[in-house]
Amino acid sequence: MSVRATARLRAEPDGRDGTALPVLAGEGPLALRRTRSPQAAYARVTVVGAMSAPLNGDRLAVEAEVTDGAHLTVDAAAATVALPGPRPDADPSTYGVDLTVGEGAVLHWLPEQLVSAHGSDLRMTTRVRLAPTARLLLREEQILGRHGEPTGALTTRLTVHHAGRPLLDQQLAYGPGAPGGWDGPAVLAGHRAVGQLLLADPSFGDAPLPARLLGPTAALTPLAGPAVLVTAVAADARLLRGMLDEAMRELLDTLKA
C-alpha cells in the first residue's frame, strides 16, 4: 500500500531577535524535529525519516514558509533513499518541496543526499518563491545508485521565482527512460554523484559574480537575477559534498566581505 504524507512548517520572528516555529507538523515518514542552531537568530529544523520512503507509488511533500524577517535552517538526519517497493507495477513515487521566503527572511535549505536505488522511479519537484529582499541557500545532491548497483529512474525539477519573476527552471533526468545521452561525455561522463548549490542574495543584483570554473567538474554561473548557481559532478557522494561545501564557504565569505 502506498504512503501519502505532507510535512508542514512555518517560521516567524519571535519578537526577541530570534525565530519561532508556530507550525511544525510531520506526517508518516516525514518527522520534523526542532534542533539546536549555532546562530541565535535562526530556528533549525531537522527532517528525520520515520520509515523507509519513498517507495514506488508513494506521494510525499514538504511545505515550508519563512515569513518576513524570520531566519530558518532546515537539514536532515540522513540521506533519502528512493526504493522500488514490493509492487513491480506501482506508479512512480513523487516528492514535492514547496518553499516560500518573505521580505528580509533567510532560508538555508540543506537536506542530505537523495539516493536513487536500482528499480526505483522517483519524480522530485522543488518550487521556491522569494520576496525581493529574501535570501536563500539551497543545496541538492543526487546519488545515482547505491554502491555497486545501477541507478534507478530519477527526474528532478527545480523552479525558483524571485519577486514574481522566473529566476531558475531546471529539469534533470537520469536512468531508465531518461533521454539518451544523460550518462554521456556532455552530461555526467560516467560520474554517479551530481549536485547544485543555489545562493540568492539581494547584493548580487548590484555586484554579480563572474562565471568561472571551480575545478575540473564544477562551475559557478551567475543567474539573470540576484543569485548564483554552482553545479558539480563527482565519482561519489563524499567528493561531491566536499566540492559543494568548499563553494558554500567561499560564497558566504564573499557576502561577508
From Swiss-Prot:
Compartments reported by the entry: Cytoplasm
Positions of the UniProt region annotated as Disordered: 1-22
Primary location class: cytoplasm
Any Pfam family: UreD
Role played: Required for maturation of urease via the functional incorporation of the urease nickel metallocenter.
Family: Belongs to the UreD family.
Name listed for the protein in its UniProt record: Urease accessory protein UreD 3
